[in-house]
Regions:
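Glycine/small-residue-rich loop that forms an oxyanion/phosphate-binding "nest" at active or ligand-binding sites
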Residues: 83-97
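Short beta->alpha connector loops at strand-helix junctions that form conserved
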Residues: 83-84, 125, 151-152, 174, ...
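Active-site/ligand-binding-proximal alpha/beta "capping" segment
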Residues: 195-247
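Boundary-proximal intrinsically disordered activation/regulatory segments immediately upstream
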Residues: 5-8, 12-67
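Amphipathic alpha-helical repeat scaffolds
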Residues: 46, 128-135, 249-253
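Structured adenosyl-cofactor binding patch, chiefly the S-adenosyl-L-methionine
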Residues: 142-143, 157-168, 225, 229-267
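Acidic/glycine-rich phosphate/pyrophosphate-binding loops and surrounding catalytic core
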Residues: 95, 100, 104-116
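RNA substrate-binding interface of SAM-dependent RNA methyltransferases
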Residues: 113-199
Length: 267
């Protein structure tokens, strides 16, 4: 049995009903980008994610076990549905549901171009793996980077896999989907644009600023030739010992962490 609570100001009405097929269909559809874009919604599962995201985004629907609702009674939602674990398994993307699933409204962010020259931001050139994108957003959160600009072919920040990998960082990091070529052209001459390349200058000996744009490239191809032309400062993450044969490249998430960490170390 599932119980639905409809919130009305500070009180709620409770009705004993079975979750509708339309709600099950809606939740299932949000695994696809097409329907996330059409509805402006996304899903999140687990206590850490749901509690973090509920502090930043409007929760459209909250489905949780009675125990979870008792332990987290400060979380508000347009609609709260009480369900047991077996019911959650029917709608969960996880093998072992953690007691709560929430549907959130996607935020719409803007940015002030004049402020970009006063802080450090990230730009992602076709990072395609949702797990890598989620990791990068988590890294941005850790290093105090608020704005991440994603190319149109970068993975969707609101896919279930990406959301899960962020571990709640979406509540604090603003993701902007842009035409990256046009966006970086608009930044040209106004702030330094950094990127990592095999022929770049050693990041550990190069002078770094505490403002600018750090571009990270695609997992297999790195930064595209079109975007490379807009990079003003080429960086190299050196391998050790120098000149010795090692792995061909670093995972983009690992590389992002090393680059952001070195920038912040200079403060």
């Amino acid at each position: 049995m599932i119980i639905v609570f409809n919130w009305l100001q500070d009180s709620f009405q409770k009705t004993n009903i079975v979750i509708s097929k339309s709600k099950i269909k809606l939740i299932a559809s949000l695994s696809q980008k097409k329907f996330r874009d059409e509805t402006g919604l996304f899903i999140a599962e687990g206590t850490k994610l749901v509690t973090d995201l509920s502090s930043a985004f409007q929760c459209s629907m909250l489905i949780a076990t009675p125990q979870w609702l008792d332990e987290n009674n400060d979380i508000k939602a347009d609609e709260i549905i009480e369900a047991d674990i077996e019911e959650l398994k029917k709608i969960s993307n996880q093998k072992s549901p953690q007691g709560v699933l929430a549907v959130f409204r996607q935020p719409v962010y803007t940015y002030n171009p004049l402020e970009l020259n006063q802080k450090l931001s990230l730009a992602l050139d076709d990072v395609q793996d949702p797990g890598n994108l989620g990791t990068i957003l988590r890294i941005a959160d850790w290093f105090g980077i608020i704005d991440v600009f994603c190319s149109e072919h970068t993975a969707d920040a609101y896919s279930p896999k990406t959301v899960q990998a962020t571990m709640g960082a979406l509540a604090r990091v603003k993701v902007h989907t842009v035409n990256l070529n046009e966006f970086l052209q608009s930044c040209a001459g106004k702030l330094p644009i950094y990127g990592t390349f095999m022929d770049g200058e050693n990041i550990y000996s190069k002078t770094l600023t505490q403002h600018g744009m750090i571009v990270m490239g695609n997992e297999g191809n790195g930064i595209s030739p079109t975007i490379e032309k807009l990079v003003t400062e080429k960086l190299l993450i050196p391998n050790y010992p120098s000149g010795q044969i090692t792995s061909e490249s670093l995972n983009v998430g690992v590389a992002t962490a090393l680059v952001c960490g070195e920038f912040r170390r200079r403060t």
